[in-house]
Amino acid sequence: MLTDHRKGAAMHWYHYLAYFFGGAFLSNSLPHLINGISGRSFQSPFAKPPGKGLSSSTVNVLWGFFNLAVAYLLVLRVGSFGLHDIPQVLTLSAGFLLMSVMLARTFGRLHGGI
């Protein structure tokens, strides 16, 4: 157990796990929101086949917003996340970066990127 000295709150390992996955969900929200808001179809888990077929822009906005809501819950409602707490920010950033690279590789194959 770690202690957040700013607030005196105990930081448990599962807080960091939540921040890591919060970063991953935050990263996953971006391509869906950007494509959906731009009116473009994009892959989603609801397409046929899942992750390869295209879903409507509306489905992508809804899926992107769901991912954003999950990121909010994992980052801001678990523990006491602080932007000035370097280990917490690095943990969130690691989840964001790992998911971003995975998404780039996955969608790059479909769109000619990688």
What residue spans do the PLM features occupy?
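Transmembrane alpha-helix/helix-exit interface in multi-pass inner-membrane proteins
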Residues: 25-39
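Intrinsic-disorder/low-complexity detector
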Residues: 17, 48-55, 59
